[in-house]
Curated annotation (Swiss-Prot):
The lineage of its organism: Bacteria, Pseudomonadati, Pseudomonadota, Gammaproteobacteria, Alteromonadales. It comes from Shewanella sp. (strain MR-4). The keyword Metal-binding applies. Substrate binds at H125, R155, D156, R187, R193, R263, A264, D265, R266, K336. GO terms for biological process: glucose catabolic process; glycolytic process. This is 2,3-bisphosphoglycerate-independent phosphoglycerate mutase.
Amino acid sequence: MTTTKRPIALLILDGWGYRENTHMNAIYHANTPVLDRLNAQYAHGLISGSGLDVGLPDGQMGNSEVGHINLGSGRIVYQELTRISKAIADHEFEQNPALCDAVDVAVKAGGAVHIMGLLSPGGVHSHEEHIEAMCRMAVARGATKVYLHAFLDGRDTPPRSAKGSLSHFDDLFTTLGHGRIASIIGRYFAMDRDNRWDRVSQAYDLITQGKAKFQYDNAVTALEAAYERNENDEFVSSSAITDSEGKVASLNDGDALIFMNFRADRARQITRSFINADFDGFERAVTPKVNFVTLTEYAADIKAPIAYPSENLVNTLGEVLQNRGRTQLRISETEKYAHVTFFFNGGKEEPFNGEDRILINSPKVATYDLQPEMSSTELTDKLVAAIESAQYDVIICNYPNGDMVGHTGNFDAAVKACEAVDACIGRVVDALAKVGGECIITADHGNAEQMTDETTGQAHTAHTSELVPFVFVGRDATIDEGGKLSDVAPTILHLMGETIPAEMTGKPLIHVKE
């Protein structure tokens, strides 16, 4: 006889922060009767999802990858940004074996060192300080042909803010005496994660052949021309930068290609296009044999040297539930599916025993302000059915809308996104009530609560460092103040009556009144 489950659901409202300032605050201005009622009726508070509380530098805004690793592991996880920055400060970076080997082999063969990555101070997918350290190290080890392929941000930074970074690197290469910016392209193309290979192919052709929609003799000139075409940083068309003789850079056999993004999800597709022999996402005109190095581990099936391999996290929530014979479901749309699976499980691809997964396809639109509800209705249909099936002890669900629509900078669309999510939460809470289940509602980081930059007046498309909501829809309870994302997994185990493993340093935040 099958035991009926009374599930605990964790609803992660991506990009849903709390901000006192109501100006251009899409969450405040949205009509959210369900969340208003739940906040009035149940125990609630605010927790931290940024900075030192999630293993990032002090004051650094949170992000989805970091947030889900902390949520799932039940401990503050030392993030790649902090780890690599520390290695640079300690002069360990310049001795990194994977990076040194790639440079040395290229130099010995008379080849070039190509460095690609998101040229941004955003700190979400990369940091330009890391890219600078790599350029300096390559020249210091004897490389005379150093080519930087700059992916432009405008998403975790203001929409038109790349000029300072490009100017800085022009000056850097002048100071070093070798190297140059070889190409620029928006992250929309180079860092797609939704199998839109027509975008990725443009970045691939640009890096391998110097084949581009536009050609300029200077990166800042190329950027200014993009702005004239009304392209913000994120959407800058492929632009090859020529040398003093009018030649473009190309990727050749024996060259080194070093990918300086440290976050995995938006690095995987373009990486596979370079290294997979059986790659079929698009027709590759050339397939140069290069020494490809990734800064961190992007996926278990990506076979390339890794400068900073992942630290092994044991006894994450998923693993503990498996070891205790519990069942669990992970569910989200394409855009955040990796976050409720790979990242929530501490960087492990394979599901745990008793872990089911449901992937809902995100809508195929150019930008999500065109469909702010995304696939939330279908996602909720599947989630409600899973609750009603009484198969699961724990359900982890991510609603991507607040973040994905927040990133577009479209205030009205972000309001609609929040309203769509609120309606879905109502359905989920009702379904849980019918089976005696309980629910924690929180977020991984802020975004939609700030849709304009108060200083520049530009659209605010980045994450924030605001606190995020923490609501317990269940038994009468109190919630501790001062919580953080790493307290969520221990809280779930505590509510289930399970012991918390020693590796989880977070503390239960919810205390049920007897």
